[in-house]
């Protein structure tokens, strides 16, 4: 296959990679790439976004050098065109600031209190978080020059804070002269209250507005705090105007937060990325990684057994490993399925009597597609809403035993509209890898609310 004379250079590379990566990775990152022009000196490719370019070069640069033409420096001679804007972006290695020998005196106040365990190299990737990790790595390499702000949202314990701190570590190590601050929303509010009390609000404003990178965790705690929201929004706008990078995390997408339209619009300026519930294979990888850190040898079959029963979030998986490690060491017990079952019986989810509901489907779809639940039930034709509404109907027909008439009534539509939506989505997922992945994320989120249905 690799020596087929009828295959172009790019096709040979694609055929080679297809046998060496997962089906999901191939469909999400390689399949969407289109060849615009190919010659013996250069290949011009169309990509859906800049993160596909980063993923391709970060993971397959060595393989690319074996197939595609090379430039004078020995790098793949590729030129990328982002599909959305049709603007050529010649391949250039990101210019990383050279590490300074020491941090200057004026920057010592900006030293970070980051979790040393939260780095990119120990963040376990899977279909549910591959895009958001690539996005975070992309903005860390080029702060203020990619998507700004980066808004990361997802449920509890899925890795949002890990990625936030990973950005901080990466920028601190590669851009040592940049001023960085990582803070929770509650800490920001407390900081503001303190400076108001001692009448030094200008000092606080000067501090935040002199930053090069602001990392804010749990922005949802800004809800229903209008005065604090206004000050945060002013700081936010100032930094964006100065091309300073901002990364924000939340448990909900911007449109679902009870914040002013002004700040929601600012949050949606850049890139909104969702961290989904990890699938089975990713949970197994997380378990094995955590076990290795604890010095616990966990066989594959045991890892799969645990992952099949503990699937809410990463923190629960880590808790399972901690408990198993302690039990095996204290009682000198071997790690068997019986040991796991006895030790983790409180963590294992009891069979749920709850069925999948239209509301749980709407909640999941709204989160993944970044739309409002009320829009899914209405007739809005705003961006992303019609497709998201069809996906919700498709999932309802797939996961709920109700009649098409009943499902249609839940959406305020007729049964024929539901049927049309289902047929449309079925056709699209055959060709659209991104949509297929989004639907998979929706199902994973729904499974957390209605686990028994997915057993």
Curated annotation (Swiss-Prot):
Relate the protein's function as given in its record. Answer: Plays an essential role in the initiation and regulation of chromosomal replication. ATP-DnaA binds to the origin of replication (oriC) to initiate formation of the DNA replication initiation complex once per cell cycle. Binds the DnaA box (a 9 base pair repeat at the origin) and separates the double-stranded (ds)DNA. Forms a right-handed helical filament on oriC DNA; dsDNA binds to the exterior of the filament while single-stranded (ss)DNA is stabiized in the filament's interior.
The organism's lineage is: Bacteria, Pseudomonadati, Chlamydiota, Chlamydiia, Chlamydiales
Species source reads Chlamydia trachomatis serovar D (strain ATCC VR-885 / DSM 19411 / UW-3/Cx)
User: What is written about domains in the entry's comments?
Assistant: Domain I is involved in oligomerization and binding regulators, domain II is flexibile and of varying length in different bacteria, domain III forms the AAA+ region, while domain IV binds dsDNA.
Could you tell me what this protein is called? Chromosomal replication initiator protein DnaA 2
**PANTHER family linked to this entry:** CHROMOSOMAL REPLICATION INITIATOR PROTEIN DNAA
Q: Where is this region: Domain III, AAA+ region?
A: 113-328
Q: Write out the similarity annotation.
A: Belongs to the DnaA family.
Q: Which SMART domains would you find in this protein's record? A: AAA, Bac_DnaA_C
Kindly list the GO molecular function terms attached to this UniProt entry. Answer: ATP binding; ATP hydrolysis activity; DNA replication origin binding; lipid binding
Indicate whether Nucleus appears among the record's keywords.
no
Instruction: Give induction info.
Output: In infected human Hep-2 cells, transcripts are visible from 11-48 hours post-infection.
Q: Does the keyword Lipoprotein apply?
A: no
Q: Which gene encodes it?
A: dnaA2
Q: Write down the NCBIfam families for this protein, in alphabetical order.
A: DnaA
Q: What InterPro entries has UniProt attached to this entry?
A: AAA+_ATPase, Chromosome_initiator_DnaA, Chromosome_initiator_DnaA-like, Chromosome_initiator_DnaA_CS, DnaA_C, DnaA_dom, DnaA_N_dom, DnaA_N_sf
GO CC, alphabetical = cytoplasm; plasma membrane
Which portions of the sequence form the region Domain I, interacts with DnaA modulators?
Answer: 1-95
- Binding residue positions for ATP: 157, 159-161
Q: Where is this region: Domain II?
A: 96-112
Listed A to Z, the keywords are: ATP-binding, Cytoplasm, DNA replication, DNA-binding, Lipid-binding, Nucleotide-binding
* Compartment(s) of residence: Cytoplasm
Name the Pfam families for this protein. Answer: Bac_DnaA, Bac_DnaA_C, DnaA_N, Hda_lid
Q: Where is this region: Domain IV, binds dsDNA?
A: 329-455
